Amino acid sequence: MHWTTNMDPKIKELELRHNPVIIRVNKFDEDSASDFAAKMAMAHNTGQSIIPVIIDSYGGQVYSLMSMISAIRSSEIPVATIVEGKAMSCGVILFSCGNEGLRFVTSEATLMIHDVSSGAWGKNEEIQASAKETKRRNKKIYEIMADNCKKPKDYFY
């Protein structure tokens, strides 16, 4: 695979203290979010100038996605997001969190976004609370993506 960009030539003359960390994301659950945070922390100790995050995912849990976004936002090293295969649902939101100029999609890849889904059940009040939370999460992820894409807050909804 070959990616091109207008990257600073100094990046090519990089000396690493350890093997670079490359993060692969194929699901969004508590375990993968924890692993993601650990690998982001490891990457800060390698001397690498960019943290590549390769996404090939159908999506998953929004709360786990939010944890991954927090790890990216707190990174002192630029994060490149690369889609191979697919970035659907949570995957496309995470893709948008890569630093500007460091978001890449292979020509064979597919991106797909949709509203947050919920499996609400229970008493009327519980269903209403779940619907309210689903609406809040949906608005939040669309605003994150709009901000990352330099669009108005309500661009995606």
Where are these regions (language model features)?
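Terminal-region recognition feature
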Residues: 1-157
